[in-house]
Amino acid sequence: MTARRFVVGTAVVLGALAAPAIAHHSSAPFYDPTKTVEIQGVVTKLHIKNPHSFLYVNVDEKGQQVEWQVEMGTGAQLSRNNLTVETLKPGTAIKVSGQPSRAEGSRGMCCIKTLMKADGSAILRGTVPREPGQ
């Protein structure tokens, strides 16, 4: 009976310790998967790093320049999709859509659905890169 209690107790403790790690890898607590927001603006910077990269975009909201933060994947994921600091240089006009932040008053998004240049050419749709001309 003592060994059984030990095994059950150990399983409970390990399960409790794993929960935060599992929760971290879900964007749902921070971004609303039931909604999509689309912004159009100019890239100010792209930070490619692990575990998450960030794209910053200046957007005109009622005559005011407001910076949006777009959470992206790892550096390796971006590289596989041909997204580099050269692809999204500061000053590049883009349109991007994704899941909006749940934080009140926040200007952020993640889980990109589309990322396009101002001329409408696709840079990225979801996680599938598009060839030029598509």
Q: What is each residue range found by the language model?
A:
Residues 1-11:
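Bacterial N-terminal signal peptides that target proteins for export
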Residues 9-20:
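Bacterial N-terminal signal peptides
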Residues 22-37:
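Short boundary/loop segments of OB/S1/cold-shock single-stranded nucleic-acid-binding domains
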Residues 41-43:
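Conserved hydrophobic positions within beta-strands
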Residues 49-59:
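Short aromatic-glycine-enriched beta-strand elements
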Residues 72-80:
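Short, structured beta-strand/loop micro-motifs enriched in basic residues and often containing a Trp
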Residues 80-96:
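Short nucleic-acid-contacting surface segments enriched for D/E, G, S/T with interspersed K/R
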Residues 101-127:
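OB-fold/S1-family single-stranded nucleic acid-binding modules
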